[in-house]
């Protein structure tokens, strides 16, 4: 690797560490000419997923767009950015695992909904209300009722307050 200080092409790796999630390797290097130390990171390069929109247009999968949706849904909720970043990484990993080149936008929406359901019930309702284009209060009530029913069926789910 080319030294950023002197441009020499020979270096030596003096330390390698894997990230907590196992997707990145951090390497400390030293230039064999000038002894300058620097850090490099290795990541697996995934093929770019394309999102197929409702109107059949295609665009590159945008991590930031997914994160923005999560952040908006979790606004003023006790959810950390680290948790949202992890959720985005999980969503993207699942999409790469399940799809080779293209993924329908509806599939991304479903994954986001699943993650939000587990993270925060209020954020989930916010996101679902926009995603499914709720037009009246009855739709909110119906969704909350379904959530409550699901919680009763699955005791491992978070308990929601009774309205």
Curated annotation (Swiss-Prot):
<dbReference type="Pfam" id="PF22811">
    <property type="entry name" value="Zn_ribbon_NrdR"/>
</dbReference>
<dbReference type="GO" id="GO:0008270">
    <property type="term" value="F:zinc ion binding"/>
</dbReference>
<dbReference type="GO" id="GO:0003677">
    <property type="term" value="F:DNA binding"/>
</dbReference>
<feature type="domain" description="ATP-cone">
    <location>
        <begin position="49"/>
        <end position="139"/>
    </location>
</feature>
<dbReference type="Pfam" id="PF03477">
    <property type="entry name" value="ATP-cone"/>
</dbReference>
<dbReference type="InterPro" id="IPR003796">
    <property type="entry name" value="RNR_NrdR-like"/>
</dbReference>
<dbReference type="InterPro" id="IPR055173">
    <property type="entry name" value="NrdR-like_N"/>
</dbReference>
<dbReference type="InterPro" id="IPR005144">
    <property type="entry name" value="ATP-cone_dom"/>
</dbReference>
<keyword id="KW-0862">Zinc</keyword>
<keyword id="KW-0678">Repressor</keyword>
<comment type="function">
    <text>Negatively regulates transcription of bacterial ribonucleotide reductase nrd genes and operons by binding to NrdR-boxes.</text>
</comment>
<keyword id="KW-0067">ATP-binding</keyword>
<protein>
    <recommendedName>
        <fullName>Transcriptional repressor NrdR</fullName>
    </recommendedName>
</protein>
<feature type="zinc finger region">
    <location>
        <begin position="3"/>
        <end position="34"/>
    </location>
</feature>
<keyword id="KW-0238">DNA-binding</keyword>
<dbReference type="GO" id="GO:0005524">
    <property type="term" value="F:ATP binding"/>
</dbReference>
<keyword id="KW-0805">Transcription regulation</keyword>
<keyword id="KW-0804">Transcription</keyword>
<keyword id="KW-0547">Nucleotide-binding</keyword>
<keyword id="KW-0479">Metal-binding</keyword>
<comment type="similarity">
    <text>Belongs to the NrdR family.</text>
</comment>
<dbReference type="GO" id="GO:0045892">
    <property type="term" value="P:negative regulation of DNA-templated transcription"/>
</dbReference>
<keyword id="KW-0863">Zinc-finger</keyword>
């Amino acid at each position: 690797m080319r030294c950023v200080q002197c441009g020499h092409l020979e270096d030596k790796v003096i330390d390698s560490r894997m990230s907590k999630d196992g997707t990145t390797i951090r390497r400390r290097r030293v230039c064999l000419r000038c002894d300058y130390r620097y850090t490099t990171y290795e990541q697996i390069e995934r093929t770019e997923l394309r999102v197929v929109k409702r109107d059949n247009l295609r665009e590159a999968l945008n991590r930031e767009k997914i994160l923005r949706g999560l952040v908006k849904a979790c606004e003023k909720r006790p959810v950390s950015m680290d948790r949202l970043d992890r959720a985005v990484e999980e969503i993207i990993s699942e999409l790469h695992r399940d799809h080779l080149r293209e993924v329908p936008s509806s599939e991304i929406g479903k994954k986001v909904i699943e993650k939000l359901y587990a993270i925060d019930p209020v954020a989930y309702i916010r996101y679902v209300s926009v995603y499914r284009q709720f037009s009246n209060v009855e739709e909110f009530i119906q969704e909350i009722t379904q959530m409550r029913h699901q919680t009763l069926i699955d005791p491992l789910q978070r308990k929601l307050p009774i309205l």
